[in-house]
């Protein structure tokens, strides 16, 4: 089986199912049973269970990197066993560039072509960031007995309501036939916490996650937030974590710019957000830094 562009179908799979038992294998086995030629790419299966904001971060950048036609099967399903149903949506995407506005490298594959992608997820906010960043063309409730069991296993909706229908879609089942079309206000979103501008030149945000296993500290302050304040590489920043841990350092393009091993560095993560690290060492672990703590940035 090939898609209309001549490639084998692709499912990129993210879950909170972990890697210590056969749960992920069951989902993949079901995908392969429905769509034997599918290529399954693991995104992540060790996200914090039920944390839709963390999951949303892992799936928002993928259309810039995956071939058109990819189906993104993404799930954390705390409402398993209820009347909840998944949502499937199509996005169109034509974009170049990563965090710094262009790809590092000149290979032909780095210029993204225009194409469409399908996301399938619980309707619990997991697609909030995807919709904000990419918009969507159409969205449907996943309810047709042609793509989900009439009596789904009540404790395993990630398999029954995400993995199974994603395989049908990868195999060519029409998106518009998975269920009724959803109005925009029927798609659940979580409230995003954007950075706040204080006193015209200070930014206040928070730590979104620790970049394991390196111990780098990622924030919700985007490159564009910094650019509005005239910040570029070399601009001196005073950054305070959790109100008590100060750093004074310039924004740098690489870890090596910190100089000696263990020195602190402020940089843009691969996703385009302000981050803090130590050169070839962990910043988060010695200070026991966690997601959710405050970040204050003063320029100059």
UniProtKB/Swiss-Prot annotation:
GO molecular function: adenosyl-fluoride synthase activity
Keywords carried by this UniProt record: S-adenosyl-L-methionine, Transferase
Entry's EC annotation: 2.5.1.63, 2.5.1.94
This protein's record includes keyword Repeat: no
Catalytic activity: fluoride + S-adenosyl-L-methionine = 5'-deoxy-5'-fluoroadenosine + L-methionine; chloride + S-adenosyl-L-methionine = 5'-chloro-5'-deoxyadenosine + L-methionine
pH effect summary: Optimum pH is 6.5.
UniProt: S-adenosyl-L-methionine binding residues: 16, 21-23, 77, 158, 211, 216, 270-271, 278-280
Pfam families named in the record: SAM_HAT_C, SAM_HAT_N
Activity regulation, short description: Activity is severely inhibited by 1 mM Cu(2+) or Zn(2+).
InterPro entries cross-referenced by the UniProt entry: Fluorinase, SAM_HAT_C, SAM_HAT_N, SAM_OH_AdoTrfase, SAM_OH_AdoTrfase_C_sf, SAM_OH_AdoTrfase_N_sf
Function summary: Catalyzes the formation of a C-F bond by combining S-adenosyl-L-methionine (SAM) and fluoride to generate 5'-fluoro-5'-deoxyadenosine (5'-FDA) and L-methionine. Probably involved in fluoroacetate (FAc) and 4-fluorothreonine (4-FT) biosynthesis. In vitro, can also catalyze the conversion of chloride and SAM to 5'-chloro-5'-deoxyadenosine (5'-CIDA) and L-methionine in the presence of L-amino acid oxidase.
SUBUNIT field: Homohexamer.
Family in the record: Belongs to the SAM hydrolase / SAM-dependent halogenase family.
Name the UniProt record assigns to this protein: Fluorinase
């Amino acid at each position: 089986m090939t898609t209309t562009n001549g490639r084998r179908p692709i499912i990129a799979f993210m879950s909170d199912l972990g890697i210590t038992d056969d749960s992920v294998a069951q989902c993949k086995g079901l995908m392969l049973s429905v769509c034997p030629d599918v290529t399954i790419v693991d995104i992540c299966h060790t996200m914090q269970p039920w944390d839709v904001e963390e999951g949303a971060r892992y799936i928002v950048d993928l259309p810039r990197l995956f071939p058109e036609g990819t189906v993104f099967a993404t799930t954390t399903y705390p409402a398993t066993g209820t009347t909840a149903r998944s949502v499937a949506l199509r996005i169109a995407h034509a974009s170049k560039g990563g965090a710094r506005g262009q790809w590092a490298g000149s290979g032909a594959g780095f210029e993204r072509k225009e194409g469409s992608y399908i996301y399938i997820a619980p309707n619990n906010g997991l697609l909030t960031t995807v919709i904000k960043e990419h918009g969507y063309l159409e969205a449907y409730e996943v309810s047709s007995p042609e793509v989900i069991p009439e009596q789904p296993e009540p404790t395993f909706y990630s398999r029954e309501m995400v993995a199974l229908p994603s395989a049908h879609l990868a195999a060519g089942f029409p998106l518009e036939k998975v269920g009724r079309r959803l109005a925009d206000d029927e798609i659940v979103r979580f409230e995003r916490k954007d950075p706040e501008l204080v006193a015209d030149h200070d930014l206040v945000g928070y730590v979104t996650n620790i970049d394991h296993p390196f111990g780098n500290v990622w924030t919700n302050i985007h490159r564009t937030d910094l650019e509005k304040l005239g910040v570029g590489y070399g601009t001196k920043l005073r950054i305070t974590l959790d109100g008590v841990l100060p750093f004074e350092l310039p924004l740098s393009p690489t870890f090596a710019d910190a100089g000696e091993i263990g020195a602190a560095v402020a940089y843009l993560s691969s996703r385009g957000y302000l981050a803090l690290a130590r050169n070839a060492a962990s910043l988060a672990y010695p200070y026991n830094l966690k997601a959710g703590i405050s970040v204050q940035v003063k320029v100059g």
